[in-house]
Amino acid sequence: MADQKIQIRLKAFDCRLIDRSAGEIVETAKRTGAHVRGPIPLPTKIERCTILVSPHADKDARDQYETCTYKRVLYIVDPNDKTVDALMRLELAAGVDVQIKLT
């Protein structure tokens, strides 16, 4: 696996959960002897939704809700077979979306 990189993108609604998962990935990769760059925080996507509270005429009565999507990216440089096996066996939290790309 010479001259290869593994890109791991993490996405979650809870920033503590994504940071804990990124830490587990970094620890696992370093334990197997690979070099890790990251976790690099990507811009947070904030979606806001405004809902009218009053069912009739009160336009001033509104509630606002927002959801924040946090993202991190990790690069594992020069991975070996142990690194790939350890990452495949790694159990992450249920609220974290993981995308893995081999370049």
From Swiss-Prot:
Signal peptide: none
Pfam families cross-referenced by the UniProt entry: Ribosomal_S10
Swiss-Prot/TrEMBL GO biological process terms: translation
The organism's place on the tree of life at top rank: Bacteria
Keywords, comma-separated and alphabetical: Ribonucleoprotein, Ribosomal protein
InterPro entries, per the entry: Ribosomal_uS10 (IPR001848), Ribosomal_uS10_CS (IPR018268), Ribosomal_uS10_dom (IPR027486), Ribosomal_uS10_dom_sf (IPR036838)
Cellular component aspect of the GO annotation: ribonucleoprotein complex; ribosome
NCBIfam families in UniProt: PRK00596.1 (NF001861), rpsJ_bact (TIGR01049)
Subunit structure comment from the entry: Part of the 30S ribosomal subunit.
Function noted in UniProt: Involved in the binding of tRNA to the ribosomes.
Similarity section: Belongs to the universal ribosomal protein uS10 family.
Name of the protein in its database record: Small ribosomal subunit protein uS10
Gene this chain is encoded by: rpsJ
